[in-house]
Amino acid sequence: MDAAAEMQKVVSLRRGGGGSSSRGAASMWWSADNGVFSRSRASSSGEDGEDDEEALRWAALEKLPTYDRVRRAVLPVVEEGGGGGEAGKKVVDVLSLGPQERRALLERLVRVAEDDNERFLLKLKERIDRVGIDIPTIEVRFEHLEAEAEVRVGNSGLPTVLNSMTNKLEGAANALGILPNKKQTMPILHDVSGIVKPRRMTLLLGPPGSGKTTLLLALAGRLGKDIKFSGQVTYNGHQMEDFVPQRTAAYISQHDLHIGEMTVRETLSFSARCQGVGSRFDMLTELSRREKAANIKPDADIDAFMKASAMEGQETNLITDYILKILGLDICADTMVGDDMVRGISGGQRKRVTTGEMLVGPANALFMDEISTGLDSSTTFQIVKSLRQAIHILGGTAVISLLQPAPETYDLFDDIILLSDGQIVYQGPREGVLEFFELMGFKCPERKGVADFLQEVTSRKDQKQYWMQHDKPYRYVPVKDFASAFQSFHTGKSIANELATPFDKSKNHPAALTTSRYGVSAMELLKANIDREFLLMKRNSFVYIFRACQLMVVSAIAMTVFFRTKMHRDSVTDGVIFMGALFFSVMMIMFNGLSELPLTIFKLPVFFKQRDLLFFPAWTYTIPSWILKIPMSFIEVGGFVFMSYYVIGFDPSAGRFFKQYLLMLAINQMAAALFRFVGGAARNMIVANVFGSFMLLIFMVLGGFILVREKVKKWWIWGYWISPMMYAQNAISVNEFLGHSWDKVLNNSLSNETLGVQALRSRGVFPEAKWYWIGFGALLGFIMLFNGLFTLALTYLKPYGKSQPSVSEEELKEKQANINGNVLDVDTMASSTNLAIVDNTETSSEIADNSQPTQRGMVLPFAPLSLTFDNIKYSVDMPQEMKAHGIVEDRLELLKGVSGSFRPGVLTALMGVSGAGKTTLMDVLAGRKTGGYIEGNITISGYPKKQETFARVSGYCEQNDIHSPQVTVSESLLFSAWLRLPKDVDSNTRKMFIEEVMELVELKPLRDALVGLPGVNGLSTEQRKRLTIAVELVANPSIIFMDEPTSGLDARAAAIVMRTVRNTVDTGRTVVCTIHQPSIDIFEAFDELFLMKRGGEEIYVGPLGHQSSELIKYFEGIKGVSRIKDGYNPATWMLEVSTISQEQALGVDFCDIYRKSELFQRNKALIQELSTPPPGSSELYFPTKYSLSFLNQCLACLWKMHLSYWRNPPYNAIRLFFTTVIALLFGTIFWDLGGKTGKSQDLFNAMGSMYSAVLFIGVLNSQSVQPVVSVERTVFYRERAAGMYSAFPYAFGQVAIEFPYTLVQSIIYGIIVYSMIGFKWTAAKFFWYLFFMFFTFLYFTFYGMMAVGLTPSYHVASIVSSAFYGIWNLFSGFIIPRPKVPIWWRWYCWICPVAWTLYGLVASQFGDIMTPMDDGTPVKIFVENYFDFKHSWLGVVAVVIVAFTMLFAFLFGFAIMKLNFQKR
């Protein structure tokens, strides 16, 4: 075969895969971390016989053409039976490697990631270098980058209902040039220039808000349109337009977005499959060709690894297994990732999945944003070390931002970029950074991590403590001065010189920059998405089974309501009942499609992330989500039609039966496509619920059943022709009424038309057989249209927008001053309102030494209290999974008799590895456990602990900071203080106290900031932590528990939080913190340590001592324990030397050693002493359980709910807006029909307007209130546990706040619709109409709340509540009037709230009209005979409607009081 033909065949083998991302292959697939070459050498030097045999196999392999050779490898045959021995060698096709073979290969190459990865990568590099192949590299240059965002300043940025409306109008006026733009620009990056070199690890540091994420996004070519950006970023001298940056570089976000129902392995495999292999295949073919020419035989295992990693289209790739191993995810590879609803992996593991998702691809440059959040320092160290090996050996480019890098992790980096207030303060080699700051007059203290020092040295508050030129007075050095000084520093000069010389493009490797948009062919991407969608459908099978069952239940109800023995064919009225049954069937099939909304929306954040990373185009995602649902439609619709068709007594012809089934299939598919499109266009659950209900409403009302075609106004007739429901209703009606059952001619009929034709004409349906096929064809057209629109929406729309950023005026001034280099005076300086604390910047140990608790005397006095606990045991029922593994005990013990004491003015750290029981112990002591078995004694200052009184004197700062999202910081504190301080504290003292607390925790500049939802809007993680502490402090507690107060924070933020904690202790309070991996200075801010080991036992309880001397002395005194190195973090050392593996190595039990120590005896004596009440003391006593009276609790809860509702435009503004729109639509659709009473159809039309409004606006209220109540409920659990209020005042606040909003909604709707439809203008009739509408909207809202109260989450609530909407719809009296309902179902009409509403509305409007209709019957008599609605019953109806409202509200309150879905 000639070379050209051979290369042609090789290219075809790649199946359309990824153009020129050559370095991608070579670097990032390796850039994970395994690396073993320890065993691979052994395998190539076996016995002579084996060598000969292997040589023959290699010779045979060499003779193959390149096309076949790159697919085959020589591998050992693993013996069966798990012995692990080798039974000779064989040639295998790398595309068909099984999981066991892949595992065995990896095990030989990289047995232990920490030890073997580097050796493995060096082997790879050696093989590539041996034949002289260059690995592509990328140098990223950025020059004069400027970025700024438009923000609203002050209160105009708060998302109130009023602001949202005025801001929208203002935005429109700005766009038209009528009004000037009131937004101000906030600088994010300012004149940022630099170079990121290949084969070097760059660490990006900077305090929060310094612009790190923006810089990383700019370098990766991923900045959004909402940020104004200038400057240029080049890769190897090429502008961004010359290649595809999203595939050349990988940006790893700080947000973990994954599909919870997929396992870790499936998530990474899908990512690898979409990203393709880049240039690995090109490199491999060239490598193979050169080795053959040079007669070089590669190492068999390395050869197999490279070949298996270079093949596209594999469902599971060897690279995935390799990355899993390096990231330490192999232990949870087959565990679900999990989310709010599905239990899954831990937060730290989820963070690693986010990293792994990009590492499995072939990108050449990595930009990684805060990849260490939630990871302990040893895991972070291991991951960064593996990345470093890959970058150094295989020529990658990496910029990584980390929050609190430990000193050993910091030392792994080559270069540092320090960013502050959007300016580069330093960029260059790690070794030169301290020299630069010493020139500026600042020195890093000995026991301080350099990374922590760098984050703090530019900050206004922290700078002073590092000033070393004591002969000169200190003055604040602004960021601008640092930035300009760096320009004249030797490192800054050399970077400027290098930037002045353009990059030599001739050095650019052709494979370095990727020019193809996607990694593999479109068909391959479609296959990958089909496989994933099928997998998710299997995992979500419960939803589909539930949906099918729900349809069958509705079908069973429908067929017993429209029972064939009660269904006659004697008059046109009977035809109307049959048509009602058909309408109900169509409607239920339509409603069934609604469940596509949440299924679509929950997957969208992950979809948008993957689309923007160019994993796949939108159509490869939308087609599988449509096609794979078709078989489900067959089952769901089949169950419905097969059950009900003959029982209801539709036309018995088999042909008509199957035609109805076919039509129902089309309706089901059309509905699913419609709601997928609505979900894709709305991208937010609340908006989608409103928009989806709105679309359904328009299609229903204009579908020809609620309002007949002849009565549709000429200005709305277009709506009739484009409503899918019209085609469905017409087709299904024609199919039924043109059948043999309906072809009789009535004796009293004036025409020769059959009964079926007359029935069709009475409802405005075209009585021609062709309308079945017209309807069916139209539905197919709508299916295509909605699926097409869904695809377009997902192709072009951005993810749902976060709320408009808003900043305080002080914050903006400070930001601008820092960039301009101005020094702010103290009065306007946002961050320095609390000068007492600014001066308090000595190191923590100095604070501890100088502290005088009385000096910071808070406004309010409190009683210092101690807490002791003796022999505390805690156990839970043994989980079923553990019993399944053969464990016979009934209980699992989590705490095994721990004892200790916490004292006033002493700060205690509660530490231990994951699973040691830190949070469990804290929950037990604080009384926060909702289940399990507790034994042992707990005393408070010598008296037995009673939870009711203890809750009043203690505070608990939870790890996940739960607060009401729509209130400001100061309002959160005011609410907490109002409910928790004694009632004798007057409002002025309370305000002073809140001010003092805000100063203590440095929240004054944020007083008017909205709290927001974590990760979505509002406060940053660190600010939320401080708010959590402040919310507990304003209760003036004596004892405070804090769970992980510094997790997820950068070094500076952690220092601020610890300063807050220290200040709190110095006021004489008792404070206990669980803490994860603290830095030296955070660890040494504590006075005492309570150290636990896995299994819930204590191994050290005692003082830390100066520079942790007591702790070090204790552990070094244990025989065999290695001594601590100079400068090493005592916290890290202590955790390392006390692990279970260390215990086994030394043959000791640290718990036993502690219990035999003198320290233990001292602690026992202290517990004994503190467990005895001091003379003259008395037990804690409060006359009432809560500090406020019941009435005041109700007022406080109502005040907070008022703020929450006023600032929730997605709920309230949209609700009022859509009510107005629906009112105007109904007014124009049913224009002037209210006064017409000539025909029965006129009454049906008027009733149709009432029925539609009640059902649709009611369901809209019910569905949209659920997420709001659900968010507030999680806050309620925390606040109730803190003893702030009882359940009833909370329920009262949540219920009462709905009244004004629902009243406004009812008045808007009532006035518009009543006047436009033309009902009779009498005061009584109008107020009855308003009365019934108001209470109906209200009971629907309370029904939605009740559903949330009774279920664990609002997803479950929406499924449960939607089951009842269909039944209420059927028994409302519109589809089938009450007298026609079979006797066995008539009882339900009396307990159906919608039936009572329609009773009230129809009876109040028409029940007293004596005007005769066309056939001579007075309207009043027709209403009484046909509907059984009596005007004289209006008073009873009103009472029943109010009773339903009260019942649902009461059930919500009862559920909140009695049910607790929080498991602790």
From Swiss-Prot:
Residues 173-446, 867-1119 form the ABC transporter domain. Residues 524-737, 1192-1406 form the ABC transmembrane type-2 domain. It is a multi-pass membrane protein. Its main location: membrane. Residues 1-26 are annotated as: Disordered. ATP 1 binds at residues 206-213. Keywords: ATP-binding, Membrane, Nucleotide-binding, Repeat, Transmembrane, Transmembrane helix, Transport. The chain crosses the membrane at residues 542-562, 575-595, 630-650, 662-682, 686-706, 715-735, 774-794, 1213-1233, 1243-1263, 1299-1319, 1326-1346, 1356-1376, 1387-1407, 1436-1456. SMART domains: AAA (SM00382). May be a general defense protein. This is ABC transporter G family member 35. It comes from Oryza sativa subsp. japonica. The gene is ABCG35.
